[in-house]
Every structure is written in C-alpha cells, then in structure tokens.
Amino acid sequence: MYKRQVNYKVAKSFTDTVKEKALGQNVLTAVKPSQLMVKIVHDELTALMGGETAELELNGRPAIILMSGLQGSGKTTFSGKLARMLKAKKNRKPLLVACDVYRPAAVDQLTVLGEQIEVPVYSEPGSKDPVQIALNAIHEAKAKGYDLVIVDTAGRLAIDEQMMNEIEAIKKAINPDETLFVVDSMTCLLYTSPSPRD
C-alpha cells in the first residue's frame, strides 16, 4: 500500500487491524491459514471502502443518472456497462446521452457502445452546450417512452473552474435521481503523484 502512495496513516491502521484480527483468530481445521488471511484482508478492505452496498434510487420517470468524474476515468465505458446491466437485470429501457462536447471521439465511443449493447444514444453533433443536450435528451426520452436516461459528461479536474461550473449547471438543469462519480485508481494515482524530478 505504501509503495502505491496510500497515505501512511491509512496503510498503518489497515495493517495493524489485519494483524490484530489474524492473531486473534482460531483457525478451524477445515480452513487453511492462508484462506483465513485472505478473508480478513478482504473484510478490512471492504470496511475501509465504505462497507455497504447501496442500491440506485431510480424513481423518476424517466430516472436520470448523471455521470461525473476525472478525465480518463472510464465514465463513457461505465455508462455503457451500467445501461446494459440495468436493461438486463432491472428491465429498464435506457437512453444514453452524449454530453462530452470536448473530447472528439466521445460521441463516437458512446455510439459504438450503444450499438454493441442495443441501447440508443442521443447526441447533437456540432452542439457545444451540454446542458441543452441533456435537457433535449430528457424531452426525447419522455416522448419515446424511455424510463432511464444516463448522461455521460466530459471529464474534469477540481481545479478547472469552468468545467466544475458546467457539471453544476447540468445537475441543476436536469435534477438527476443519482449522480455517480466514476474513479479509476490509476488515474487518481497520476493526478496525485508528485511531478518527476531530474
């Protein structure tokens, strides 16, 4: 953990807790010590990351999910996976919305994903107004009977005030049922790593 730049205090607390639990366990004859150790580490990692799974609150008609996150964190890919899962397991009729107006291939990527999973994609080629695109998509979803709208937005950094204002404006305009923040641990590592030294 330390080599992967996890905060020292977090890593120390985690390893101390794992050690304490491992030393305090009586190993059942049916369980190997290595299996017990894997379970303890898994349980502690789960607790460290929040511990509980929460269901999505998708009560609106259509229900709206706003995707947000850092640049390159996988929002577009996750949007497609989420649409496929909710379509298959929750019998939803999703519409994907391409609101990343900055990355040239973003609309194409979402369109290809939509075709692969047989989920339509709403886009407005040439438009540079993601707020209006999202509002128009919701209007179309209502008109065509889609019960789920997944809005894929551009990646951003907290230090980019214009982009932060944009995601705030989108959220205010569409009032989503859920806002999901997509994070990739390697991307976060890149953003938090110190700059290279000569």
Indicate residue ranges for each PLM-predicted region:
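Alpha-helical scaffold elements adjacent to nucleotide-binding pockets in ATP/GTP-utilizing enzyme cores
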Residues: Q109-L113, E166-A169, S193
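Conserved ATPase-coupling elements of RecA-like P-loop NTPase cores
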Residues: A106-V107, I159-M164
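Structural motif
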Residues: V131-L135, L189-L190
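Primarily NTPase-proximal linker/entry elements flanking Walker-type ATP/GTP-binding cores
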Residues: K3-C99, A106-S127, A134-T153
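Conserved small/polar residues in nucleotide/adenosyl-binding loops
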Residues: M1-R4, Y191-D198
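Conserved nucleotide-binding/hydrolysis micro-motifs of P-loop NTPases
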Residues: V101-P104, S127-K128, G155-A158, S185-L189
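Inter-motif core of Ras-like GTPase G domains
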Residues: N165-D184
